[in-house]
């Protein structure tokens, strides 16, 4: 049954959903990687699609920018449409010198300056982590394709334009691999409602040095990331038998 933000019916979504921030990226993923594609959502322009990848039913839908937006869509997909696994696929900014442009980062955990998980967890710190099997499958999928990935902590920021640039030094000290805006929220939603989640990001810019990828470089690395995500789903299916 449709929700206030998703005009689909039960069964329209697969049990696994890839979620980029940009709904046009969702459209690109569906048109480039999936077959027999059907559009299943267009409320507020947040496009969602379902198709097949190598015969496996998979959905893809945008989640917008920031934890409040992605939390709405993740929650409704899980509680109203039976989604079991969410893979966020997006971009991040690096703060460490050893993390390079175009690196693919798998978010094993996600720190945040948001208070949403404290609200969920009775004002205590909650360790927002990805599902282990999904993480392992993504690493294995990358290795099978000959791609190197970095695995570690992300930082999910509430503000894109931060008033506290000194925080980047703290992130660097604590080994944060990338800064984005959603992973901690999605991990919190998945935990609250009994689902599983993973975040895979490509490094699109270096926050400290100011380096940025070109549009062509972003597209190539983005496609590598999507293939890792899709192949990891197939590996997960093999484990379930």
UniProtKB/Swiss-Prot annotation:
One GO cellular component, as annotated: cytosol
Reactions the enzyme catalyzes: a purine D-ribonucleoside + phosphate = a purine nucleobase + alpha-D-ribose 1-phosphate; a purine 2'-deoxy-D-ribonucleoside + phosphate = a purine nucleobase + 2-deoxy-alpha-D-ribose 1-phosphate
Residues bound to phosphate: 21, 25, 44, 88-91
Site location (Important for catalytic activity): 218
Family annotation (SUPFAM superfamilies): Purine and uridine phosphorylases
Keywords recorded for this protein, A-Z: Glycosyltransferase, Transferase
Record: active site: 205 (proton donor)
CDD domains the UniProt entry points to: PNP_EcPNPI-like
One annotated GO molecular function: purine-nucleoside phosphorylase activity
InterPro entries: DeoD-type, Nucleoside_phosphorylase_CS, Nucleoside_phosphorylase_d, Nucleoside_phosphorylase_sf
Assigned EC number: 2.4.2.1
GO BP annotation list: purine nucleoside catabolic process
Record carries keyword Transferase: yes
UniProt cross-references to Gene3D superfamilies, sorted A to Z: Nucleoside phosphorylase domain
Residues noted as binding a purine D-ribonucleoside in the record, renumbered to the chain: 5, 180-182, 204-205
Enzyme's top EC category: transferase
Assembly information from the UniProt record: Homohexamer; trimer of homodimers.
Role according to the record: Catalyzes the reversible phosphorolytic breakdown of the N-glycosidic bond in the beta-(deoxy)ribonucleoside molecules, with the formation of the corresponding free purine bases and pentose-1-phosphate.
Family matches, as HAMAP family: Pur_nucleosid_phosp
Recorded family membership: Belongs to the PNP/UDP phosphorylase family.
Protein name: Purine nucleoside phosphorylase DeoD-type
